[in-house]
Design a protein with these regions (language model features):
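Hydrophobic residues on short alpha-helical segments
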Residues: 11-15, 45, 57
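Residues within the DNA-recognition helix of helix-turn-helix
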Residues: 40-43
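Basic, Lys/Arg-enriched C-terminal extension of HTH/homeodomain DNA-binding domains
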Residues: 46-68
Length: 68
């Protein structure tokens, strides 16, 4: 099995994002700050070389990192 490019926390954040949770809701659910949620999202976008959340989601699905 291939090693995930996402940390467990990044994966949790994106799994909630694709379920239409807001940044605030994700922060509350994972018991972390809004800023930390945004940092996780930014880190993933940097890893993937994409400019937006939607593009990150598409790439993660292509890479089998996320299932919808």
């Amino acid at each position: 099995m291939m090693h995930s490019i996402l940390t467990n926390r990044e994966k949790q954040v994106f799994e909630l994002l694709i379920q239409n949770y807001s940044t605030k809701e994700i922060a509350y659910k994972l018991n972390i700050s809004d800023k930390t949620v945004r940092n996780h999202i930014s880190n993933v976008m940097l890893k993937l070389g994409v400019k937006g959340r939607a593009q990150a989601v598409v790439e993660l699905i292509k890479l089998n990192e996320l299932r919808v």
